[in-house]
């Protein structure tokens, strides 16, 4: 009972929403209006009402309370929801708007004139309820070309072209609802930078092309100079190479008077190129060779001053020589050169120098240089053959001696390449009275072409004899027999590749001294001892151990202590090495030792390393390990 009373009291104290609605004056008015209806329905049983008056209103109260329940906010909200039409969120329904006024079709002329208010005909206005569900969908993009096509279809064919042509500019500006604005307006940071195309200037382009051509020409000129200098330094080492370089594939036609005048500028160019190639020689050699060149030029002038009668006799002598066989010509030339013809040797050296000059200037004019060199050589040889019949003057003998005793092969090349060696002959041939001399020169050139092979064969045999014989007098005879142009080919300057063959000295070679045996070093006894591992001195271990024991110790005990200390220090060294390697160092530092002693338990926060050293080690070791203050305001060890 007490529980029920308490429950009722709690209900009264905190009324529910239903009780609050019932207690409202509006609810009471509704109950009063419904009481007559209830009494009419229960008019038949009045007697029963008296008997159980308290029960009848209780029977009809549920109907009244059911009506009252319908008035709650929940029921009212439910009824509102039930009265509303059912709309599914998935299946969208388009709302059809009733058109109050029928849209009258406008003529196309009026519709095209109002381009600002023109809208798309196919688009249907959407309801707000529908657009809420279409927020995530993208609008359909419509291009202007499609819009124009649709407009053309709806317009009559007669007015389509005229109206669209007149309103083409305005149609591009009209506002179409479905056309999206370009993204470039909103996101200007994403715009691509316009490419700046530089305008090409024709004058600048042509100037650049000309500069490139000039650079290419300059590079080609430098390459030509380098190749010409390299060809000038190449050497002909063997006699076979000399023969190959002097051979010809065909007999060239003889030069006439007209060709001489046409070839003169080429000769001057070849002379200048030869002068350029000769500038690389040292200055002191040039000074020594200039005297020889002047002597040779004076002798050539003397030989060219002979009369025409002498030249005719020489010409007859040359005709007699041509009837001989090549073998006899080779033998006669060998005998003639051995006896008294050093000038012919000089002419042959001149011929060889002309061929070398041709190799040096091959990059500039190959074919013209061959003709010029052969012409100059034939001129000199003709003049010298004419002078062979005459008696040799002292000056000619001096020239022969100069040509025989030249120390360096550079002198012969300098004489061949200098303008003084060929200028008198070339100038004297241009005179009107020198026609017989020209004919003699041409014939002597043909003779030398046929006889040079025999001379070279003899030179090869003599070269082999020179290699086999080592005595000095035999080498001198062989050098006299061999022609000068073979020596010039063998002793050409070799500044880069290989040095020239040295001339043998007249002094006899000394026998080699016997090599003395080196004294064997005496082996010391300390070196024969086996190397031992580093270890602590036994005296130090005894001293430290006796310091702490302070009692007499036997020898066996010291041995055991030494073994223990050795093992202990080996283990310490391995641990310290591991610590240093782990730290990335190759040296053991104080921090590694302190870390090891801390792990062993010797060093702690209460017992630092310095205190431990001061307690257990004597003064001499303390001075080495930790700083100690001494008299005189000094600290040991000094840091």
From Swiss-Prot:
What GO molecular functions are on record for this protein? DNA binding; protein heterodimerization activity
Stretches of Polar residues bias are at 267-281
Bias (Low complexity) occurs at 12-23
GO cellular component, alphabetical, reads:
kinetochore; nucleus
Question: Where in this protein does the record put region Disordered?
Answer: 1-64, 266-294, 307-451, 458-477, 494-534
**Keywords attached to this entry:** Cell cycle, Cell division, Centromere, Chromosome, DNA-binding, Kinetochore, Mitosis, Nucleus
Q: How does it assemble?
A: Component of the CENPA-CAD complex, composed of CENPI, CENPK, CENPL, CENPO, CENPP, CENPQ, CENPR and CENPS. The CENPA-CAD complex is probably recruited on centromeres by the CENPA-NAC complex, at least composed of CENPA, CENPC, CENPH, CENPM, CENPN, CENPT and CENPU. Identified in a centromeric complex containing histones H2A, H2B, H3 and H4, and at least CENPA, CENPB, CENPC, CENPT, CENPN, HJURP, SUPT16H, SSRP1 and RSF1. Interacts (via N-terminus) with the NDC80 complex.
- Check the record and name the Gene3D superfamilies matching this protein: Histone, subunit A
Function noted in UniProt? Component of the CENPA-NAC (nucleosome-associated) complex, a complex that plays a central role in assembly of kinetochore proteins, mitotic progression and chromosome segregation. The CENPA-NAC complex recruits the CENPA-CAD (nucleosome distal) complex and may be involved in incorporation of newly synthesized CENPA into centromeres. Part of a nucleosome-associated complex that binds specifically to histone H3-containing nucleosomes at the centromere, as opposed to nucleosomes containing CENPA.
Q: What further note is attached to this protein's record?
A: Association with CENPA-containing complexes may be indirect and due to the proximity of centromeric nucleosomes containing histone H3 with those containing CENPA.
Q: Which family does it belong to?
A: Belongs to the CENP-T/CNN1 family.
Q: Where is the composition biased (Acidic residues)?
A: 458-469
Q: What is known of its domains?
A: The largest part of the sequence forms an elongated and flexible stalk structure that is connected to a C-terminal globular domain with a histone-type fold.
- Regions of biased composition (Basic and acidic residues) lie at 307-319, 329-338, 356-371, 432-449
Q: Where in the cell is it found?
A: Nucleus; Chromosome, Centromere; Chromosome, Centromere, Kinetochore
Q: Where is this region: Flexible stalk domain?
A: 80-500
Please report the name of this protein according to its UniProt entry. Centromere protein T
Biological process terms from the Gene Ontology for this record are:
cell division; chromosome segregation; kinetochore assembly; mitotic cell cycle
């Amino acid at each position: 009972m007490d529980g029920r009373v308490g429950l009722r009291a709690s209900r009264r104290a905190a009324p529910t929403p239903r009780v609050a609605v019932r207690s409202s004056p509006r609810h009471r008015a509704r109950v009063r209006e419904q009481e007559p209806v209830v009494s009419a329905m229960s008019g038949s049983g009045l007697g029963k009402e008296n008997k159980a008056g308290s029960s009848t209103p209780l029977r009809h109260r549920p109907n009244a309370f059911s009506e009252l329940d319908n008035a709650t906010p929940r029921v009212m909200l439910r009824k509102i929801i039930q009265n509303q039409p059912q709309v599914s969120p998935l299946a969208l329904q388009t709302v059809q708007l009733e058109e109050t006024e029928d849209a009258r079709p406008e003529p196309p002329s009026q519709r095209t004139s109002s381009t600002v208010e023109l809208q798309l005909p196919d688009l249907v206005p959407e309801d707000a309820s529908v657009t809420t569900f279409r927020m995530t969908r993208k609008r359909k993009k419509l291009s202007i070309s499609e819009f124009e096509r649709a407009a053309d279809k709806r317009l009559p064919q007669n007015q389509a072209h005229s109206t669209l042509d007149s309103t083409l500019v305005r149609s591009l500006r009209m506002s179409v609802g479905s056309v999206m604005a370009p993204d470039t307006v909103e996101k200007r940071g994403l715009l691509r930078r316009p490419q700046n195309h530089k305008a090409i200037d024709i004058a600048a382009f042509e100037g650049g092309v000309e500069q490139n051509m000039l650079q290419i020409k300059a590079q080609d000129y430098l390459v030509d100079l380098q190749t010409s200098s390299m060809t000038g330094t190449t050497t002909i080492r063997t006699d076979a190479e000399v023969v190959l370089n002097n051979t010809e594939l065909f007999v060239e036609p003889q030069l006439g008077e007209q060709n001489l005048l046409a070839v003169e500028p080429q000769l001057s160019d070849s002379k200048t190129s030869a002068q350029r190639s000769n500038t690389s020689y040292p200055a002191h050699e040039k000074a020594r060779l200039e005297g020889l060149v002047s002597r040779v030029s004076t002798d050539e002038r003397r030989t060219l001053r002979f009369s025409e009668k002498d030249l005719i006799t020489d010409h007859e002598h040359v005709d007699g020589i041509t009837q001989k066989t090549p073998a006899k010509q080779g033998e006669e030339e060998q005998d003639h050169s051995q006896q008294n013809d050093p000038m012919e040797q000089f002419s042959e050296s001149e011929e060889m120098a002309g061929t070398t000059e041709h190799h040096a200037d091959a990059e500039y004019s190959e074919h013209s240089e061959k003709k010029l060199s052969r012409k100059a050589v034939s001129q000199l040889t003709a003049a010298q053959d004419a002078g062979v019949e005459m008696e040799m003057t002292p000056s000619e003998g001096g020239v022969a001696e100069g040509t025989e005793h030249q120390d360096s092969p550079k002198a012969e090349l300098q004489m061949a390449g200098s303008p003084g060696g060929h200028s008198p002959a070339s100038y004297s041939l241009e005179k009107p009275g020198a026609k017989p001399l020209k004919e003699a020169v041409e014939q002597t050139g043909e003779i030398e072409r046929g006889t040079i092979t025999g001379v070279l064969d003899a030179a090869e045999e003599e070269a082999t004899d020179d290699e086999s014989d080592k005595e000095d007098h035999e080498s001198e005879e062989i050098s006299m027999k061999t022609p000068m142009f073979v020596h010039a080919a063998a002793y050409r300057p070799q500044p880069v590749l290989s040095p020239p063959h040295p001339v043998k000295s007249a002094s006899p070679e000394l026998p080699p001294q016997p090599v003395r045996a080196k004294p064997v070093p005496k082996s010391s006894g300390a070196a024969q001892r086996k190397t031992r591992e580093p270890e602590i001195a036994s005296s130090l271990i005894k001293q430290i151990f006796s310091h702490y024991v302070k009692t007499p110790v036997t020898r066996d005990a010291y041995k055991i202590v030494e073994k223990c200390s050795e093992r202990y220090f080996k283990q310490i060294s391995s641990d310290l090495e591991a610590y240093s390697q782990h730290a990335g160092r190759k040296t053991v530092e104080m921090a590694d030792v302190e870390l090891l002693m801390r792990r062993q338990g010797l060093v702690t926060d209460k017992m630092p390393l310095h205190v431990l050293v001061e307690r257990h080690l004597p003064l001499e070791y303390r001075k080495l390990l930790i700083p100690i203050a001494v008299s005189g305001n000094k600290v040991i060890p000094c840091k």
